[in-house]
Each structure stands twice: as C-alpha cells, then as structure tokens.
C-alpha cells in the first residue's frame, strides 16, 4: 500500500518552551487507512496534528528536526495553501476553526476556496454538496456564531471537506459533543473513510478506536510508546502505563485469563468478547 504520511525522527520544541513537545517521532500511514492516535493529555497529540497539516512550522514557530511528508511534499517546504489540497484538520473546539469574517454558514464553508481561484458557480455547487453531506442545508443562511456546538462542528468538518482533501486529520473533534452528536459525526467520518479518504483521528474513546482503527499509535511524554493493530496495542499490559483506559471487554478477558480460563487472545471488540467468554465457560 502507498504511504501517504511519513514522519521520520521528528522532534519539535515551541519557541520559549522549557521542554521538547515531540521527541523523535517516526511512523507512516497507508492510503485509505483509519489511523488512531491515543494518549494522555499533554502527550503531544495536538502538536503532532499541527505538524501533519503544516501549522508547524508555518504558524507555530519553534525548533524542529526530522521530517514530515504528506504524499510527496515536505511539509517544511510546502505552503499551507498547497498542503490544504491534500490534508485537512478539524479542531477539537470547532469555534477555533471559524473565520469570524463570514456572515453565513454558506460563506464559512466557502472561505477556504477563495485562496484557490474557484469560480462562483463551482463554489456554489461545492457548498451545496458539502451541506447535504453534513445535513446542514437548512443552516446555510444562518450566522455560524448563533449555532449550537454540534452544528458548528458540522460546519467545521464541512469547511475542511469542501477542499476535497485526500487525508483528514481529526483532533478529538467530537470531544465537546454529547454522545448522540459524537456518534453522528463519527458515522460521517467512517463513511468518508469507506469511500477512500485516509483518516488520522485523535480520540479518547477506546472502544470506538478498537472498533474502527486499522492502526493505533500510543503517545506518551512526546514519544511513540506503542504502534500496531488494536489487538496488539490493547493486549499489551504496558499500554495502560501511558494513561490509556483500555476497553472493558479487554479488561474482562484479561481477568478471565488470570482466573485460569483458556483464552488464547484477548478480545478487542465486543463480539469477540462474547464469543470467547461463551467458549471459555463451556
């Protein structure tokens, strides 16, 4: 499979910071995959997301080493405008993504297209398509600042998708939503991934990570502490040392193993857990 993200020995320290936020981070992401980044607060996840879309080094200034490549482009020598054709970021707080110059949701969705010479007709067509995808057709004439948090999150995701990126980076973009709103946004993201978009997602919901991820990377104190399939990462006892709350059915499987039940592998999905427990109790 083609590697669309390649991070090699990347370190970064913000200007005037007293410590290095990212330390010799290396990993790659395959085209069309669902790649999840997990870790405790302060482990460097958001900084890494900023590096993947070019906000580091072009917006956040500091000292760096190593390289970050998106497709064939070196982030350090590419402009953010050029990178936005390939990779888009959705922030944890959707209000941080608003332009604050757009008077309507339609203008907010179209804001990024203005840097790429898109015709008015094409712009209207793209806005209509993204609004339908995000189920916000009825909000196009509304002021973004008057919307609910869940509605603004849809607008933020839509304003990223309108650029038609091949790679979507999500920095805990459902953290401020209620459970229903969170699942609605996640369902959209999952469908986009099934259609071929590469997804890099920071998330604290380990059951959701176990359910959807092709690869899971654990961050701790600015370093990569584990990298593998959900089965590999959640079955490793070392994972919990980095503030990861592993899924309950993994804990249950481990408890059954400790109690003497013959479970060759730990379950990382609920259906696996039910099947294994039934077999163990026969």
State each model region's role:
Residues 221-222:
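Conserved ABC ATPase "signature" C-loop
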Residues 143-147, 151:
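Conserved ABC ATPase signature
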Residues 168-171:
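Catalytic Walker B motif of ABC-type/P-loop ATPase nucleotide-binding domains
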Residues 239-282:
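ABC ATPase nucleotide-binding domains
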Residues 162-166:
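A short, proline-enriched helix->beta-strand linker immediately N-terminal to the Walker B motif
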Residues 110, 121-139:
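Conserved ABC ATPase "signature" region
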Residues 203-204:
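H-loop/switch region of ABC-family ATPase nucleotide-binding domains
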